[in-house]
């Protein structure tokens, strides 16, 4: 059975991207909008294209993604992570170039929580001797 739709999930900080790849012409639709419409004029478009260019599949798949959580920058990174994982589903041969480019690794850095008795995560209240 040949699968014509590939699904993967990408994450970054609090952003979660659910990504579906279908054979097509390279359209990227995010939350039922074009990427330029959703992210605005200035966004990291090269990050979305990087997984495709790494695996020589540029403009061979259409991307339909739903994004939620986080900010726009984290959402772009989550989308790139999801696309990379979906490309891995399309062809296991894509693993080596994607891994060498560092696109399969989830960036686990998240905001550190505020601690009680302190002003922030690491910042302390100002100390007064008297």
Swiss-Prot record:
Keywords linked to the UniProt accession: Ribonucleoprotein, Ribosomal protein
Region (Disordered): 109-130
The UniProt record lists the keyword Zinc-finger: no
UniProt GO BP: translation
Domain of life: Bacteria
GO MF annotation list: RNA binding; structural constituent of ribosome
Listed GO CC annotations: cytosolic small ribosomal subunit
PROSITE patterns (alphabetical): RIBOSOMAL_S9
UniProt cross-references to HAMAP family, sorted A to Z: Ribosomal_uS9_B
NCBIfam families reported in the protein's UniProt record: PRK00132.1
Alphabetized PANTHER family for the sequence: RIBOSOMAL PROTEIN S9, SMALL RIBOSOMAL SUBUNIT PROTEIN US9M
Family of this protein: Belongs to the universal ribosomal protein uS9 family.
Name of this protein: Small ribosomal subunit protein uS9
Organism in which the protein naturally occurs: Desulfotalea psychrophila (strain LSv54 / DSM 12343)
Taxonomic lineage: Bacteria, Pseudomonadati, Thermodesulfobacteriota, Desulfobulbia, Desulfobulbales
């Amino acid at each position: 059975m040949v699968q014509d739709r590939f699904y993967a999930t990408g994450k970054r900080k609090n952003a979660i991207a659910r990504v579906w790849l279908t054979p097509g012409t390279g359209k990227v639709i995010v939350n039922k909008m074009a990427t330029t419409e959703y992210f605005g004029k200035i966004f990291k478009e090269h990050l979305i294209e990087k997984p495709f260019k790494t695996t020589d599949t540029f403009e061979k798949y259409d991307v339909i993604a739903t994004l939620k959580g986080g900010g726009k920058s984290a959402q772009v990174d989550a989308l790139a992570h999801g696309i990379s994982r979906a490309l891995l589903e399309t062809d296991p041969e894509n693993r080596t170039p994607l891994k060498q480019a560092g696109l399969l690794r989830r960036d686990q850095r998240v905001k550190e929580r505020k601690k009680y008795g302190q002003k922030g995560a690491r910042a302390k209240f100002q100390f007064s001797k008297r």
